[in-house]
Amino acid sequence: MNLHYLIQEPKIIHEKNPVLILLHGYGSNEEDLFSFAPELPNDSYVISVRAPYDLQPYGHAWYAIHFDADENKFSDNEQAKESVALIASFIEEIVKQYPIDTKNVTLIGFSQGAILSYATALTYPEKIAKVVALSGYFNQDILPEVIDTKAISHLKFFVSHGTVDQVIPVDWARKAKPALENLGLKVAYHEYPIGHGVAPQNFFDFKNWLLR
């Protein structure tokens, strides 16, 4: 495997089971979102992936974030694109290793993981069915120059954000819905009165959305 991961096997076994792939945020690790696993749909594999870049003294990132002298923040978009390709090849590997329904692959990303979930789904739509993007934003700079709207037409998105998020402003998150709808996609968009995190109601709402 090209990426380290934790896995929870489904409790209800089908010939092929859905998979929920969890992508953590900057500076975190695969154990963070895996705490959701016991509460997620029990017919699904739950796989929580560790990002490839080590941070000091601990934690991991999908791509570097740099600051200039004025504290402006810059994402390493080339690294981000490389991580998108890594996630796509990781999906190819796990569907060979486990009896996974390749038509039922969901990405659940938080923060930096959400940013990459958007990009992975729109770059490799044949591998993804649904995206849950928690506390992230839609980064146009890491998307393909040309998006085939027919190839992505099956994709469904659940997008949520905290209205008092100090890490990624809610205004950034709000741009995702019109951007995705302009591509002809269905988007469920929710806001919660919290900061940079996942409120219990947020979890409840995206879990119910997954079960539809």
Question: For each predicted feature, which ranges?
Answer:
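C-terminal catalytic histidine-bearing segment of alpha/beta-hydrolase fold enzymes
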Residues: D171-R212
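Conserved alpha/beta-hydrolase "nucleophile elbow" surrounding the catalytic nucleophile
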Residues: H24-Y26, I108-F110, G162
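Short alpha-helix in the alpha/beta-hydrolase fold that links the catalytic acid
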Residues: F34-F36, E145, P169-A179
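A conserved short beta-strand
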Residues: E126-F138
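Gly/Ala-rich beta-loop-alpha elbow adjacent to hydrolase catalytic centers
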Residues: G109-G113, S117
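Short beta-strand/loop motif that positions the catalytic acidic residue
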Residues: F158-H161, D165
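Alpha/beta-hydrolase fold nucleophile elbow
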Residues: P99-G109
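Serine-hydrolase catalytic machinery in alpha/beta-hydrolase-like enzymes
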Residues: H4-I13, N17-I100
